[in-house]
Amino acid sequence: MAGRELSHLQQLEAESIQIIREVAAEFDNPVMLYSIGKDSSVMLHLARKAFYPGKIPFPLLHVDTGWKFKEMIAFRDAQAKKFGFELLTHTNPEGVAQGINPFDHGSAKHTDIMKTQGLKQALNQYGFDAAFGGARRDEEKSRAKERVYSFRDRHHRWDPKNQRPELWRTYNGAVNKGESIRVFPLSNWTELDIWQYIYQENIELVPLYFAAERPVVERAGQLIMADDERMKLEEGEAIKYEVVRFRTLGCYPLTAAMHSQADNLEKIIEEMLLTRSSERQGRLIDSDQSASMEQKKRQGYF
């Protein structure tokens, strides 16, 4: 009897689960990077499916910059409690001691010290030899050319000219001591795939993805949410309440909201079918300079 043909989402799911299982079997000390966003939520769901009814056999790591939305941190802790996975958090102590923040030091320095350096500290501290990330190739041009198994040297740096071939879904995970692999099981998914899968699987998300009235400040043509008392207003700025949602999440001073009436999954999917702009246009760190994402990844960024 002929086998049942898999749907597009089922094919993506099967591929991702196979990658997750292969990494768990092949590497000595893997970890899943958990940024709390929609892609991380899908990746967590896939990991739970991959090892059901057992528990996820590796920890989740959140690199906390201290500037995430309050709702993100509350959601992170609630998910860890609900599903019982091991959650590791790390904040760069040197950055905290220096008082590094996105307002006074700018997005580039804040991101480098609190995210890139913080991530490298955590990977070194625990000795992880593989780290899952939720990046997708459709997000940004430097990610479009990255392999599923992305080799990193002893300093966690990525060299786009020194990548390994991946033929017929055959992945090379061989590393020497101190080297590691970043693994991207969602590489072949699109933003629309992510949202349709979230709808199909009824995956919980941070409420910030859904339209609601929120306090925002308009700055350089972008809407920045005033998430707490640390929000610094520039001359002539005022907080106003607008119906907005977030297409992508990060540190709140560096993440722009968008006007939207999409307050449920069906409306978000409809919005995605009509949009012609990149989801990362709301990430202010991507506009630091030309090719900034590739430069960050070369230095060890996610």
From Swiss-Prot:
InterPro entries recorded for this chain? PAPS_reduct_dom, Rossmann-like_a/b/a_fold, SO4_adenylTrfase_ssu, Sulfate_adenylyltrnsfr_sub2
What pathway or pathways are given for this protein in its record? Sulfur metabolism; hydrogen sulfide biosynthesis; sulfite from sulfate: step 1/3
SUPFAM superfamilies in UniProt: Adenine nucleotide alpha hydrolases-like
The cross-references to CDD domains, in alphabetical order and at most eight, read:
Sulfate_adenylyltransferase_2
Reaction equations catalysed: sulfate + ATP + H(+) = adenosine 5'-phosphosulfate + diphosphate
- The EC category is transferase
From the UniProt record, which GO molecular function terms apply?
ATP binding; sulfate adenylyltransferase (ATP) activity
Q: What is its EC number?
A: 2.7.7.4
In the UniProt record, the signal sequence range is none
Keywords, alphabetical? ATP-binding, Nucleotide-binding, Nucleotidyltransferase, Transferase
Q: Where is this region: Disordered?
A: 280-302
Pfam entry (one)? PAPS_reduct
Describe its partners and assembly state: Heterodimer composed of CysD, the smaller subunit, and CysN.
Per the entry, what this protein does is: With CysN forms the ATP sulfurylase (ATPS) that catalyzes the adenylation of sulfate producing adenosine 5'-phosphosulfate (APS) and diphosphate, the first enzymatic step in sulfur assimilation pathway. APS synthesis involves the formation of a high-energy phosphoric-sulfuric acid anhydride bond driven by GTP hydrolysis by CysN coupled to ATP hydrolysis by CysD.
This chain's protein is named: Sulfate adenylyltransferase subunit 2
Provide the species name.
Shewanella oneidensis (strain ATCC 700550 / JCM 31522 / CIP 106686 / LMG 19005 / NCIMB 14063 / MR-1)
Q: Which classification does the entry list for the species?
A: Bacteria, Pseudomonadati, Pseudomonadota, Gammaproteobacteria, Alteromonadales
- Give the gene name: cysD
